[in-house]
């Protein structure tokens, strides 16, 4: 009877051990899954944080010196247009003169009937001139100034566009390095723990000394990488604070929905050529240059002015306030330059070459934009797959590290394998973070090239 009980007892213990053997991997797997999910950092801002950031972005732009400088340039262009319009209005001038005759040919003649017409004279007067016709020279000058003003408005918008892209890039940089900084600090901590375990094994004679040397090398490598990331973060943060001093440095990336992007190559290239702000500026400069060519041609022709002049004078006294006589003149002034030493021809040639230069610049710009758009599209078309691939690689390395940690507790797993798992995890983390940054930045760059970034930021901040 006792033997029967002992046999049943041994069978019962065997069953319990078997059950524990099968349950333990399930528990380990569950623990592994939860652990690997928890190490993945939250890289993107939520909706409310993004909205607040875009609002702050708009405020930072209008306070930035680059924007204020563009405002000053725009104000100058407006005044240049006013100057171009001025010849169409009456030109009023006031003048005065006093004359003291020093010598005259009449003084040497002995004639009773001849005398100098002027001896001493003091006069003052007012002159009013009104342009009648100048073969459209003033019209061309006004059109040139107006097109340059419109070009300056586009330049201001482009500066805002570039400034917004620079600020967003700075946000992505600070967020990327901040995320990696936290991951690397955690990794250095784990490197230190593993190295300490290896040191204990070496001192107790259970592992060769070379393992401790390799562990110290891996630890130093992790610390150096952390130092590099911290330096990059400090540099990115300093640039961020210069651009946006009133905003807290980004700790997460500002996202961009892929559905907001244009993915059709032909459509995007056409949109870029038609709506790119640099192209718009050059087109307006070309129009202004054409008006300048027409203006230089019209300068070969004469000008007609209507003049009205009134004089008060005293024909007998030098430097006197008693101006007893007056004259009033009304006439038409005909003015033309017969010979200028080749100046007008040179001015015309310069105007033509400026027009040619702008045309060539536009062609070059169109090629550069087309190339940039094609490059961005090739990156954006595979963006989702790349993001998922790098996230999967990060999660897989996280699971591998967790599995090795769990196996270390139950078997004699090499601690150097744990260090290698830590290195693989950090490398996959860097790839994941920088790939996410690259994808987001490509989207915002497309918006900037298409001239849509300013409106996108304004709408996203509402």
What are the roles of these predicted feature ranges?
Residues 30-93, 103, 208, 244-287, ...:
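Bacterial Sec-pathway N-terminal export signals of envelope proteins
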């Amino acid at each position: 009877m006792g033997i029967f009980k002992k046999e049943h007892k041994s069978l019962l213990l065997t069953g319990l051990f078997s059950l524990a053997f099968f349950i333990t991997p399930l528990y380990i797997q569950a623990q592994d899954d939860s652990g690997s999910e928890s190490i993945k950092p939250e890289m993107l801002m939520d909706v409310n944080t993004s909205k607040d950031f875009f609002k702050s972005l708009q405020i930072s732009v209008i306070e930035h010196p680059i924007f204020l400088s563009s405002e000053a340039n725009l104000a100058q262009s407006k005044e240049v247009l006013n100057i171009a319009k001025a010849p169409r209005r009456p030109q009023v001038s006031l003048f005065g003169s006093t004359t003291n005759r020093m010598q005259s040919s009449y003084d040497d003649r002995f004639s009773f009937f001849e005398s100098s017409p002027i001896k001493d004279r003091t006069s003052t007067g007012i002159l009013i001139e009104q342009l009648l016709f100048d073969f459209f020279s003033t019209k061309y000058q006004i059109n040139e100034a107006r097109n340059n003003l419109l070009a300056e408005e586009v330049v201001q918008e482009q500066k805002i566009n570039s400034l917004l892209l620079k600020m967003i890039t700075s946000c992505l940089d600070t967020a990327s390095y901040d995320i990696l900084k936290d991951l690397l600090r955690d990794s250095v901590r784990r490197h230190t723990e593993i190295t300490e375990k290896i040191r204990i094994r070496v001192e107790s004679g259970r592992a060769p000394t070379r393992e401790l040397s390799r562990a110290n090398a891996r630890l130093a490598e992790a610390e150096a990488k952390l130092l590099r990331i911290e330096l990059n973060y400090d540099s990115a943060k300093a640039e961020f604070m210069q651009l946006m001093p009133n905003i807290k440095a980004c700790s997460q990336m500002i996202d961009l929905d892929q559905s907001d992007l244009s993915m059709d190559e032909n459509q995007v290239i056409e949109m870029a050529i038609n709506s790119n702000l640099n192209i718009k500026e050059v087109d307006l400069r070309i129009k202004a240059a054409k008006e300048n060519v027409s203006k230089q041609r019209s300068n070969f022709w004469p000008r007609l002015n209507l003049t009205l002049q009134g004089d008060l004078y005293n024909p007998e006294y030098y430097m006197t306030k008693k101006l007893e006589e007056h004259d009033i003149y009304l006439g038409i002034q005909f003015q033309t330059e017969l010979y200028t030493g080749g100046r007008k021809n040179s001015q015309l040639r310069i105007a033509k070459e400026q027009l040619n230069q702008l045309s060539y610049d536009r062609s070059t710009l169109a090629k550069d934009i087309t190339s940039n758009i094609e490059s961005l599209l090739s990156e954006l078309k595979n963006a989702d797959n790349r993001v998922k691939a790098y996230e999967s690689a990060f999660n897989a390395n996280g699971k591998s590290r967790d599995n090795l940690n769990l196996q270390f507790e139950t078997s004699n797993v090499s601690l150097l394998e744990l260090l290698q798992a830590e290195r693989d995890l950090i490398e996959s983390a860097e790839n994941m973070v920088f790939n996410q940054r690259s994808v987001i930045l490509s989207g915002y760059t497309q918006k900037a090239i298409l001239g849509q970034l300013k409106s996108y930021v304004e709408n996203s901040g509402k």
